[in-house]
Structure formats: C-alpha cells, structure tokens
C-alpha cells in the first residue's frame, strides 16, 4: 500500500475517532458507549469507554475513546494501535503519569491501573480477543507485545467535558 493511501486511511480514522469522542462528550455519555464495529471485524455491541490522562509532553488533559472489556470488576483496554510497531501515545502517557480516569456511558471514575503479567496476562489477552477479535490480527502484524491495561475504580468523578 502506498504512503498516500496509508495517510488517507490514518486521516479517516482520526476524523472518525474525533467525531465519536465529540458525540460521547456532547451527549454526556448517553451516546457512544456502544458501537457497531462489525464492518471492521468487531461485534455489533462493542463497548467503548473514555480514558482521561495528562499528556507526558504537553501537560494537557487528554481524553481518548477506547474499546474495553470488564473482567472481574476491572476495566481492560488494549494498547493495539491497529498493530503498529510502536505503542499508542495514550499508553505512553498513562505509563508516564500517576493518575487515570475513565468514563463508561454516564459514569466516570478516578482509577488505579496496572498491567497483568504471566498467566494472568494470558487469560486477560484471551478475554480481550473475544471482546474485539481484530486484536488477534493486530498482534500478528507486529513484533511488540500489545500492552493490556487494567483499571480499577477508586471513586466517582464528574463525567468528562
């Protein structure tokens, strides 16, 4: 695929993600939590959360919409970046920071986060492949291990704006 084609795909993806984030925020979480991602290999009822963190370089608050799964009361997200060979910025920012917040539909929380390891990671990875089947192909397309982040709510916070 040409660099020009890749640039067009990247722009379309950014435009789609921006529109989705704006809808989620504008509706105060009433819209945007459930998405039909069958056209890209996902499920009809794919769950999306918002993750809020501080940019490691900018120091600004950033909100990113991400697919998630709930595993044993922890919210699990995958730093896939579509199988790119480098980690997504949101993951690097979370790792560099201390605090993370997430919003699911109309509820938001301050949270702790961790990365599962060993046999727990294997179980969480299997679970996330069920949440969003394209993760399997994403992992196959890169040499890096796709990071998994598990967030545990600490206390409710205001929904994101």
Q: At which residue positions do the language-model features occur?
A:
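A short, polar/charged loop/turn motif at coil->beta-strand junctions and beta-hairpin connectors
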Residues: 42-45, 145
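Extreme N-terminal tail/first-helix region
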Residues: 1-41, 161
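Short beta-strand-to-coil "C-cap" segments at the C-terminal boundary of structured domains/repeats
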Residues: 151-157
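Short beta-strand segments
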Residues: 45-82
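Short Pro/Gly-enriched beta-strand edge/turn motifs at strand-loop
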Residues: 31-36, 45-51, 132
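Short, structured beta-strand-loop surface elements
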Residues: 3-4, 9-11, 80-135, 141-145, ...
């Amino acid at each position: 695929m040409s660099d020009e084609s890749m640039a067009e795909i990247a722009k379309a993806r950014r435009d789609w993600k921006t529109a989705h984030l704006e809808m989620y925020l504008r509706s105060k979480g009433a819209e945007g939590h459930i998405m039909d991602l069958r056209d890209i290999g996902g499920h009809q009822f794919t769950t999306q959360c918002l993750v809020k963190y501080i940019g490691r370089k900018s120091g600004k608050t950033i909100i990113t919409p991400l697919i998630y799964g709930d595993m044993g009361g922890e919210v699990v997200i995958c730093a896939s970046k579509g199988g790119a060979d480098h980690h997504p910025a949101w993951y690097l920012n979370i790792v560099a920071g201390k605090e993370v917040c997430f919003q699911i539909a109309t509820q938001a929380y301050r949270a702790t986060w961790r990365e599962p390891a060993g046999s727990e990671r294997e179980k969480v990875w299997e679970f996330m492949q069920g949440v969003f089947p394209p993760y399997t192909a994403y992992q196959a397309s890169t040499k890096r291990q796709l990071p998994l982040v598990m967030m545990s709510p600490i206390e409710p916070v205001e929904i994101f704006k």
